[in-house]
Structure formats: C-alpha cells, structure tokens
Amino acid sequence: MLQSEGELVAPLIERQGIKNADYMFSAAKVIIELKILQTDFAQTTQTLEKVDELIAKHPGVDPDDPTEPLRRELLLLLRKPLQRVINTANRQIKETKRELGLHDWSGITVCVNDGFRSAPPDMVLGLLGHILAQTSYSNTDALIYQTNHYVELPYSPYANLLWYPTYSDPTNDGLVDFVNDLGRKWRQYSAKELGPFDVSEEYDSLDLVHASVVTGLRRKNRYTGP
C-alpha cells in the first residue's frame, strides 16, 4: 500500500484508544482498512461441533441442497465470523474519518484471504456480498477480495491470484479507477516479490461458480478453455 502513494494512518492519530484504519491516499481521498483472513473458519473445533449438531438436527437432509434450512444454517456459521471482520473494518474507517475530519472520503476494506481455504471463492464472495447487502455500512464504499493462495478457474490453464472488487455504488468512476490502478500496482509488486507471472489479466466480470482453491499439482476440474 505504501508503494502506491499511500501513507499510514496511525502516526496521524493523536488521541489514545482510537481504532483507526490502516492507510490513507490523500490524492484520491480514500481510506483503506486491511483485513487478513488467517483462520479457516469452517475447520475450527467450535464450527465442526456446530456442524455435527445441525446435521443431527436435520437427519437425512442433503447439506448442499440450497432449498433446505440446513444449508442456510450451515452458511450462517461461516457468515458470522466474516460479518465480525466487516463490522470491525467499517468502524475503523468511521473512526478515522471522524478523528481526521475526512467525512467526504471513500472507505475501502481490503479482505485478504490467507487461511480460509476450505470454502470455494464463490462461497466466500457470496457470503461477503450478502453481508454488505443486508447491513448498512455507510463508511464502506468498496470491498476488495484478494487471495494469498492460488485459485483454479475452469476457463484458465493457470493457477490464479484473485483481486475482486465490489462497490456500493459502481457508478463512482473515480473510486473504480483508483481500485483498478491499485490492483495493477499490486500485481506489479507481487510479480516482483514472487517472480514474473505466466499471465496477468483483467476482466470486466469474472465467473467464479466453478472456481476452487488450488491444493495440489492436479486440477480439480477439467480445463474448458480454448
């Protein structure tokens, strides 16, 4: 972030006990809070115990059937920890705006998925999208979902790192341009740190329905591209 003309917020906060956001970009009037998902929420002992309880509560029901209450209750288990993350980020952006008098600035939460790998990308994004749609986050104008692990796409022969932005107002061209530029700089930085990529592409839209987290050398789904 600092290599993209951003600066740390913390040194600018004078009062003690303020839970501030991480970065600010003065030229674009943007505040960014970075959240890293380090826990695999679906694999914690507490979650697994609750899953067993729900399955026992709904005997014989297919947990993958979207029409069944069991499916909705299972997804709710994963939604709750993600909602806590988004709630915290929104509050930190709000506190930063208030402390520094940046009331007309835009707020962005960058959600980096490092450890939550048991859920496919479309499920994580679906949960995040549902959270943002069902709750008022007046200080979060955009959310960027980024992966620190590789993702397999049926229509791509490569393992991919995702940078997937969503907006509360997609007609805010200035914010969209800023996010796109930040994404390009992130790709350049990643290529410098990790080595050159085989391909670096941008899409107006991305179908993640059959995307999956790369866990080994073999593909999970057949490559369907040209």
Region annotations inferred by a language model:
Residues 19:
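Beta-rich catalytic cores
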Residues 23-25, 30-36:
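Conserved catalytic cores of phosphodiester-cleaving nucleases, focusing on short active-site segments
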